[in-house]
Amino acid sequence: MKKRMIALMLAGIMVLSVTACGGGGASSKNQNNQDDGESKQVGVEVTEDMQSAPPEDAPVGGQVVVAISPGTLSPDMYGGWSNNATNSGFIGLMSGYALADYNRDYVLDWDPVVVKDHEVIENDDGSKTYRFEINDNLKWSDGSPITAKDYVFSLLLHSSPEFAACEGDATYGWALVGYNDHVQGTTKEFAGVNLLGDYEFSMTISADQLPNYYEMANVAYGPEPLAAIAPGCDVKDDGNGAYLTDGFTEDLIRETLLDPDKGFRYKAPVVCGPYKLKSVDLTTETVELEINEEYLGTYDGTKPHIQTIISKPVADETIRDEFEKGTIDFYSAGTGEKIEAALTKVEEGKLDANYGLVPGTRINEMRYMCDFGPTQFEEVRRAIAYIVDRDEINKQLTGGYGTVVDCYATDATTDFAAIKDDIESELIHYSYDLDKAKQELIDGGWTLNEKGEEYKEGTDKYRYKEVDGELMKLKVEVACCEDDYSKLYNTVIPPEAEKIGMEYKYTSMDFALRINHLNRQGIDEPEYNIFYSSIGIPEILFYWNCFDDDPSLMGSWNVNYISDPELKAIGKEMQKVDPEDIDGFRKLYGKFQLAYNKKLPSLPMGSGVSYMFFNPKLKNFVPRAHVGWGAMVLDAYFEE
């Protein structure tokens, strides 16, 4: 099968950030007392094609301090739950040994560090079995061996009703034979997962999930530590599929996963990535990672050379000052004023930094909740789009270093770049137009006043609509934080909403509370129709999950809670494209983007480029798109 670029990400589809966070930083011992030797190259622009594995003789040591936006660190330190952009950087560095990994061209292939041998078998019933033998030298951070049981356990755990009851993402293996029966608890066996030996196992993709454009991604899972998460339990296979012995219960994993002092969700005591968790303090928002000495490296042999990584909350207003003082190693500037000011200081020799351009891969958006209230109706979503001057807002926020996007992609997205010229003229470019906004509401039935009589502009303040026999007020509730984006939105949008008969009410809250409302965790009923957020657009995305209204996908994959037959149908068509048929996939991809542009599950506000400035002593650090700071740090090393 032709190797394809795959993005094994939820969220984010599922990854959330309110504002662009600063990058990272170094302890003062790394930047202070710098010499003026020839090895210190300052003011150098690095480009993506300069990335590589660190040299074999690169020194190991030093400390990188990652600047995070104050108030954004959540308790989650382990994969399997909704985590934001701040946490995902640390979690990613503690994760490893997936069966497939990306090369530096973002092409997914089997990881030779993990996979010793594999075989693909096409079965008579139309299903397809992937059989793996893993290497026998892999270890967890505690020194215990990683075996086939740990890979099988990962699938059994993350597709179990017990894990779902712990508010975890229980969608692992969703394309495999027997997934539905296992996740619903109908059978203890997972029919499409088989334990074949100490280092051998297999996964079988269901016939109804084939062909599948991202086929390899459906079996590219990593391990979980069976002995640590489910002590006393075992993985068995009697021929009908792998299963966990009777000791595996919800109470057991609640203790091992959710205990606030030692649970995996919060403390990640055993991992297999390049780094392991040394400590975490939510009060000071300090996360400290250290090298996992048991880690064998990525597919190309890349191993960590920075000894420790530590977080430091830094306000956006002071992040460059912190960098200049030598307390942080790198930071991102995302507005024209900040970019140009920093570049000028570098050119004048007043800012000790190297730098690189990072193309925009995130969309700032107004994320609609499409399952309740006025925003469940597409006419309301479009009406809001017509009362917002997106072009002017984007210009003010980025200083000209950004673009307004009209669909679910950015200019850095390869598939979109390939079809942009074909569909751009058909995309609606929503711009300020009160008449169009009002017409959308009229077309959507928002033609009544609070008495149920005909709405009269100039007399009645707010519009209403009869929904399920009752009057629904045209009122949208917005959850936001106290950032520049929110402040500007909340200044310009509410008065325009009043002009079309809409009440637009915003509530500012801290980041953690907003995340709880967004993820609907710890709340009785959803309250907010709109969240100001940003979302990363990976090179490859499971569109068929992101817009599927299956209850198990709502919130984790389908972040808009949208139930739209057209988006769902196109997504399923995209899934069924043969991996070899790139043109066929892109044709459907364009069709999807046009539908998204009309349905507006979210209103894209813009996408901006950023410049990352970093300590010149941090060598082999290459800013680039489609990876987070963690991948850049993993390549890097300090050179005094």
Regions found by a protein language model. Give the residues of each.
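Surface-exposed binding/hinge segments that line
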Residues: 168-252
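Periplasmic binding protein-like
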Residues: 66, 143, 323, 328, ...
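N-terminal lobe/hinge region of extracytoplasmic solute-binding protein
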Residues: 65-123, 270
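Append "and occasionally in soluble cytosolic enzymes with long acidic Gly/Pro-rich linkers
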Residues: 290, 376-494
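Detector for C-terminal structural segments
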Residues: 387-423, 485-494, 520-640
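Ligand-site clamp/hinge motif
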Residues: 262-266, 294-342, 503-505
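Gly/Pro-rich hinge or "lid" segments in bacterial periplasmic/extracellular proteins
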Residues: 103-105, 219-301, 308, 435, ...
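Aromatic- and charge-enriched surface segment that lines or borders ligand/interaction sites
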Residues: 117-170, 196, 202, 322, ...
